[in-house]
Amino acid sequence: FIDLSADFRIEDSKLYKNWYFLNHNAKNLVKKSIYSIPEFTKNRIKNYRIIANPGCYPTSIQLALIPLLKKSLIEANNIIIDSKSGYSGAGKNYKSKFTHQNIESSIFAYGIGSHRHMAEMDQEFKKILKSNIEYNFTPHLLPTFRGILSTIYLKVKKNVKITKVHSELKKIYKKSIFIKVLKINTPMGSGNVLNTNNCEISVCKTRYNNKIIIFSSIDNLVKGASGQAIQNMNLAYGYKESLGLK
């Protein structure tokens, strides 16, 4: 089955309790589950009984960063991640959570340095590097209902040019039906991906040769939730990956 909660995203039950303040009552099933961003797991997903659907922020962020970390193209420290989401990202009871703010007409930072989605990102990044990466993540809610735009500030490795970063992302997602890597320095927002299972990624230069900015945009309610669950289901059962999504 496919689980859209966080219950099977965190493989370490102690970490799960630290972040979610709950005892895991199905520890025996955690080993039978896979944390699945389908672009990275499609060849393994059939081997697992339980599919843990990732969080919305981690989906947008990992689609941009994981290929670059795997190829050691970027420095794994001092990464700044600024993610902005429609207020639906705060859950169905968002109004009760932010009673002191008029969330439908203001911008609001929350979960500063402590958002629970960091737990799954820590875990997945560590699988690649075998050590923790150093990053700061701050999510913001915008006065719009849906959509996520993650802005990621990072430093490239010595002698790595922006064209190499861009070409690697293009190569990784060449056959992907849902991920689109835009031309270098393409300004972007969330409008193109709303109500779709798509992700758009843009790599942009800065005035410093060793620093770049990557933008990654998804619909938090589709690629960040139900759409990704359907994509995972299609792959798990051998259906066409885009079934019900295109």
Report residues per predicted region.
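N-terminal Rossmann-like NAD(P) cofactor-binding subdomain of oxidoreductases
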Residues: 1-105, 110-112, 204-208, 243
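Conserved active-site and cofactor/substrate-binding residues in soluble primary-metabolism enzymes
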Residues: 32, 56-63, 112-120, 164, ...
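NAD(P)-dependent Rossmann-like dehydrogenase/reductase catalytic/cofactor-binding core
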Residues: 200-246
